[in-house]
Swiss-Prot record:
Cofactor note: Binds 1 dipyrromethane group covalently.
GO biological process, alphabetically ordered: protoporphyrinogen IX biosynthetic process
Family assignment from sequence similarity: Belongs to the HMBS family.
Enzyme class: transferase
Stated name of the protein: Porphobilinogen deaminase
The keyword Manganese appears for this protein: no
Cellular component GO terms held in the UniProt record: cytoplasm
Anything else known: The porphobilinogen subunits are added to the dipyrromethane group.
HAMAP family membership: Porphobil_deam
Length: 329
């Protein structure tokens, strides 16, 4: 490679940290290919890593430490220089990044909706009473319990291929997955129905890819700038602001979804109890040109949820989760 052909300040090699699941590697390869197209003289590599979240498969995330389990090892690689950037599904990234790290880019968003997947049934309504439905999140569990109390909702862990394998061997009559992951892996044919956001409000950031860097690496942020999608980033920022303000994590069935309509960003947020017996929702819209605008919109929705009693729900669930983790230690 002729270093003289590289843009000024661009290194000969860029390294992307990624989890090693098939979906995570697809996402990392997607970013790698985009960077190679932008900077053909730069050698862009992927550093595959196994995170603690990938290793713990017998318990739900809410019982073992939450979303941070999927990113800590990748952040360690950023901190010590083994990697220049890390690629994440934004719904799996904690709402507040640790000190010293920054979200440098949000790429154009894929479908944020949840997908109904089954080999024998066309929709949730078609399932018989008592049918076993698998889900990996408290948010989806609460939705199912609220809207379909006749179903038997059970935890579902593992990567995407593992979850589909559990369905195929008959452990579940149906499972609920993020549509984005299925589409990215060419598995859209497995989707029997897409759940309308009014019926299953997505998790904050669902369907979006985020690129994390060490905050000190302004050089990397500059190289990633062409990959940043401003409209997607503002929508995700508003969603994450709702969750951040309420202390959202894997312990809480909290959802937030923003969509552009008529030049305005429309944001809906929801908090519920895990049994689905109580569901709170709030909506607001505004013209949002900057991250500050998106944050303000998110705060309006979180404030509205707090006025309805969301704080008490969140605090009770977080306390219960902490007690469960302490008991299982």
């Amino acid at each position: 490679m002729n270093s003289e052909t590289l843009p000024a300040e661009l290194p000969a090699t860029l390294t992307i940290a990624s989890r090693e699941s098939r979906l995570a590697m697809w996402q990392a390869e997607h970013v790698r290919d985009a960077l190679r197209k932008l900077y053909p003289a730069c050698d862009v590599k992927i550093l595959g890593m196994t995170t603690r979240g990938d290793q713990i498969l017998d318990r739900t995330l809410s019982k073992v430490g939450g979303k941070g389990l999927f990113v800590k090892e990748l952040e360690s690689a950023l901190a010590d220089g083994r990697a220049d950037l890390a690629v994440h599904s934004l719904k799996d990234v904690p709402m507040a990044l640790p000190e010293g790290f920054a979200l440098a880019a949000v790429m154009s968003r894929e479908d944020p909706r949840d997908a109904f997947v089954s080999n024998d049934y066309a929709s949730l309504d078609a399932l018989p009473a008592g049918a076993v439905v698998g889900t990996s999140s408290l948010r989806r569990e609460a939705m199912l319990r609220a809207r379909h109390p006749r179903l038997d909702v059970r935890p579902l862990r593992g990567n995407l291929d593992t979850r589909l394998a559990k369905l195929d061997r008959g452990d579940y009559a149906a499972i609920i997955l993020a549509a984005a992951g299925l589409k990215r892996l060419g598995l859209a044919a497995r989707i029997r129905a897409l759940l309308d956001v009014d019926d299953s409000l997505p998790a904050a950031g669902q369907g979006a890819l985020g690129i994390e860097i060490a905050a000190r690496r302004a050089d990397v942020a500059a190289w990633l700038a062409p990959l940043h999608d401003h409209a997607s980033a503002l929508a995700v920022e508003a969603e994450r602001a709702v969750s951040r303000a309420l202390g959202g994590s894997c312990e809480v069935p909290l959802a937030a979804h923003a969509v552009w309509r008529g030049g305005e960003l429309h944001l809906t947020g929801s908090v519920s109890t895990t049994d689905g017996a109580r569901v709170l929702a709030a909506h607001a819209h505004a013209r949002a040109a900057t991250a500050a605008d998106a944050l303000a919109l998110g705060r309006r929705v979180s404030d509205a949820l707090e006025r309805q009693g969301a704080r008490a729900i969140v605090d009770a669930l977080v306390a219960a989760s902490a007690q469960a983790q302490k008991g299982g230690a």
